[in-house]
Amino acid sequence: MTLKRIFCAALALIVLQSVASAVDYCRLSCPEGRDHVGCRNAGFGAHCGSNPQTPKLHQEHIKMVLQKTNWLRGVVAEGSFCYPKAARMPVLVWDDDLANLASLHTKGCVTETNKCRSTERFHSPGQSSYEISGDTLPSAMDILNFALRDWYLQKDNLTRKDIGSYPAGEDKGLKNMANLISDKVTAIGCGLTHWEEGKLKRALFTCNFSSSNVPGHPIYQRGDNFATKCAKTHPYYKSLCNSDEHIKPNNNV
């Protein structure tokens, strides 16, 4: 089998491993004082100006997000950017519950909120958001690319020390990169909303990650070489564990 066919087959499996469910989010456990973003949330928020829309992310968008994030995880696992090699970093798959909650978040048209975003499988998801505005907006594909690049560039703020112990306190422009390369994260799901404010057009893109980084805990476990603790490596992203690696995303909760 050619490398191209292996990649296409592996990517198809990653995309197909999404999880669709009809969940009553009002019943899910949330930290005290925090409302769930999915509880009784059926419309756009008060900050959405005029003509808000939440376009569906199609397979080409999902594939691009998975390709970019797994490429980044792969090169980080190999020790790029002077980071330590990752012993057990899994390849990411798409999760429909995380994507649905990300879409609901963007419908609030506010980048940061304190709302809970837990799912039945993932109790404390991480989140990254990107907002763009202008007289016109780029295509959805371009917005997604801009967001991923913006988060990736936070590598300049994330140090080897941070990898070993995620820093507490105020975010120093590294949270989004840390979300992308956490070895507790096994799944990702994203959403996009755009709206108008007078002549200005705005868009908010958000991705939810299956686990969040905890201060004082490592972002990922380092190893003498990459993938040394994987039960099986991915057929294309050879420095990452396969998608069926048994990772417990809620251990830090």
UniProtKB/Swiss-Prot annotation:
<keyword id="KW-1199">Hemostasis impairing toxin</keyword>
<feature type="domain" description="SCP">
    <location>
        <begin position="66"/>
        <end position="209"/>
    </location>
</feature>
<protein>
    <recommendedName>
        <fullName>Tabinhibitin 3</fullName>
    </recommendedName>
</protein>
<keyword id="KW-1201">Platelet aggregation inhibiting toxin</keyword>
<feature type="signal peptide">
    <location>
        <begin position="1"/>
        <end position="22"/>
    </location>
</feature>
<dbReference type="InterPro" id="IPR014044">
    <property type="entry name" value="CAP_dom"/>
</dbReference>
<dbReference type="GO" id="GO:0090729">
    <property type="term" value="F:toxin activity"/>
</dbReference>
<dbReference type="InterPro" id="IPR035940">
    <property type="entry name" value="CAP_sf"/>
</dbReference>
<keyword id="KW-1217">Cell adhesion impairing toxin</keyword>
<dbReference type="InterPro" id="IPR034763">
    <property type="entry name" value="P14a_insect"/>
</dbReference>
<keyword id="KW-0800">Toxin</keyword>
<keyword id="KW-0964">Secreted</keyword>
<dbReference type="Pfam" id="PF00188">
    <property type="entry name" value="CAP"/>
</dbReference>
<comment type="function">
    <text>Inhibits platelet aggregation induced by all agonists tested (ADP, arachidonic acid, the thromboxane A2 analog U46619, thrombin, and snake venom snaclecs (TMVA that activates platelet through GPIB, and stejnulxin that specifically acts through GPVI (GP6))). May act by competing with fibrinogen for binding to glycoprotein IIb/IIIa (ITGA2B/ITGB3).</text>
</comment>
<comment type="similarity">
    <text>Belongs to the CRISP family.</text>
</comment>
<keyword id="KW-0732">Signal</keyword>
<dbReference type="GO" id="GO:0005576">
    <property type="term" value="C:extracellular region"/>
</dbReference>
<feature type="short sequence motif" description="Cell attachment site">
    <location>
        <begin position="222"/>
        <end position="224"/>
    </location>
</feature>
